[in-house]
A protein has these predicted regions:
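Short beta-strand/loop motif that positions the catalytic acidic residue
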Residues: 116-117, 122-124, 128
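Alpha/beta-hydrolase fold nucleophile elbow
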Residues: 25-36
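Conserved alpha/beta-hydrolase "acid-adjacent" motif
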Residues: 129-135
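Glycine-rich nucleophile elbow surrounding the catalytic serine of serine-hydrolase chemistry
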Residues: 35-45
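Catalytic histidine-centered segment of alpha/beta-hydrolase-like enzymes
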Residues: 155-168
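Hydrolase active-site cap/lid region
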Residues: 49-99
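Catalytic histidine neighborhood in serine/cysteine hydrolases
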Residues: 140-158
């Protein structure tokens, strides 16, 4: 996290999408994007920026709140108000760089994600304290009837049980099979 920004991750995602589209064996009408946690935030932004190139979006515990909370110098409930002074924030032993914070000030992930017009699958645990379930609830509001939303009761961010992981995987697999092959 020290040398990364959400904007940089989005740029990487766009480059990956371009690469996938350049492959001869890829059916360009059947490209889906999947993301977990901050990767879910990034995936939703890539889909919003490239709506014509993405046919479906799958998100597990998306974490756009990381961006919004950084504007208040908070990261997953941890005060990181010393980030400008130190040049980084210490979050659970990980250095989060000043660039991450500065980048977050100019981003609005939900506004970018709202440009995506296709179907979406959301899976979130109701005991997630890393990325609040409110993030997926907000995405559901944005995407409306185009979004399926599975709440896995008792699951936290890492889905630390076989049953939780199976529910998450089954939901995404059924959705992607339907959207890509149906």
């Amino acid at each position: 996290f020290e040398d990364m920004t959400v904007s940089g991750e989005v740029e990487d995602g766009l480059a990956i999408l371009d690469y996938v589209k350049s492959l001869d064996f890829v059916d360009q009408s059947r490209i889906a994007i999947h993301g977990l946690s901050m990767g879910g935030c990034v995936a939703s932004m890539v889909a919003g920026l490239r709506d014509a190139d993405v046919c479906a979006l799958s998100l597990w515990c998306p974490a756009p709140d990381v961006v919004y909370n950084m504007k208040h110098k908070m990261l997953c409930g941890v005060d990181v108000s010393d980030i400008e002074e130190k040049g980084y924030a210490d979050y659970e032993g990980l250095r989060v760089g000043l660039g991450f914070y500065q980048d977050a000030l100019d981003l609005d992930p939900y506004a970018v994600a709202a440009k995506f017009t296709k179907r979406v699958n959301l899976v979130h645990g109701d005991e997630d304290v890393t990325a609040s379930i409110h993030c997926s609830e907000r995405y559901k509001e944005i995407y409306g009837d185009r979004a399926e939303f599975l709440v896995v009761h008792g699951a936290e961010h890492r889905f630390k049980s076989c049953a939780f992981r199976a529910a998450r995987m089954d939901s995404a697999l059924a959705f992607l099979t339907r959207e890509l092959l149906g």
